[in-house]
Amino acid sequence: MAATGEALTPQGYIQHHLTNLSVGEGFWTWHIDSLFFSVGLGVLFLWLFRSVGKKATTGVPGKLQCFVEMIVEFVDSSVKETFHGRNPVIAPLALTIFVWVFMMNFMDMVPVDWIPELAMAAGIPYMKVVPTTDLNITFSMAIGVFLLIIYYSIKVKGISGFVKELTLQPFNHKAMIPVNLLLETVTLIAKPISLALRLFGNLYAGELIFILIALMYGANWALSTLGVTLQLGWLIFHILVITLQAFIFMMLTIVYLSMAHEDH
């Protein structure tokens, strides 16, 4: 499959599947496919949970309601065990992060050629369907968490308290202020960077493995048979990966915001 309709080499096939549909150039490049799927899945999440919430009954719940309630209770218990402050925003935020990230990760379960082939038939040359394999998406979410950390740190501790936290820890001496400021600034900035890169790295690697396995289908029958076995095995294992990465992103967000609420 190729944008020009010609057969691709293995290298070209891999590159094609790792290329976003984009407009603009340089810093102002917009990845249309990542935005479409991330926003679309976010809207689907809101619609689904709102629909279940409106139809919730005290009687015998349906399967979908049971599933949603199970997710909500799991996230709520995770917040209660981890977050030590009082903030009604944290639980809904954690639920949104967990479900939204999981849904974006779950797009990696779709066979790698299905949606790109449909896009090609419609005249669209590139189509990446897993938003969390786009560093722009993972960094956008991580920066959002980072801004919340700064906001609640200042709201709870005040500007002076926040500045003291940056300048008087871990060494409580005026002479160590430059060292403290350097250490705390690096620690603070490392939080969104680690959030973004961890999610991106795991999902990008998972997608690349699916693409490499898909290449085997174009070889002889022996490699094609092996490819089916490998894809099934990796699919089962990857379900654990995508769930775990959504959980880790949620838990680290809760931990970071809990730390922001701690008034030293």
Swiss-Prot record:
Transmembrane intervals: 29-49, 89-109, 134-154, 177-197, 208-228, 235-255
Biological process annotations from GO: proton motive force-driven plasma membrane ATP synthesis
Keywords tagged on the record: ATP synthesis, Cell inner membrane, Cell membrane, CF(0), Hydrogen ion transport, Ion transport, Membrane, Transmembrane, Transmembrane helix, Transport
GO molecular function per UniProt: proton-transporting ATP synthase activity, rotational mechanism
Matches recorded under PROSITE patterns: ATPASE_A
Membrane-protein topology: Multi-pass membrane protein
Coiled coil start-end: none
Main location: membrane
GO CC field: plasma membrane; proton-transporting ATP synthase complex
InterPro entries: ATP_syn_F0_a_bact/chloroplast, ATP_synth_F0_asu, ATP_synth_F0_asu_AS, F0_ATP_A_sf
Entry annotated with the keyword DNA repair: no
Localization of this protein: Cell inner membrane
Listed PANTHER family: ATP SYNTHASE SUBUNIT A, CHLOROPLASTIC
Subunit description: F-type ATPases have 2 components, CF(1) - the catalytic core - and CF(0) - the membrane proton channel. CF(1) has five subunits: alpha(3), beta(3), gamma(1), delta(1), epsilon(1). CF(0) has three main subunits: a(1), b(2) and c(9-12). The alpha and beta chains form an alternating ring which encloses part of the gamma chain. CF(1) is attached to CF(0) by a central stalk formed by the gamma and epsilon chains, while a peripheral stalk is formed by the delta and b chains.
Purpose: Key component of the proton channel; it plays a direct role in the translocation of protons across the membrane.
Record-given protein name: ATP synthase subunit a
Gene designation per UniProt: atpB
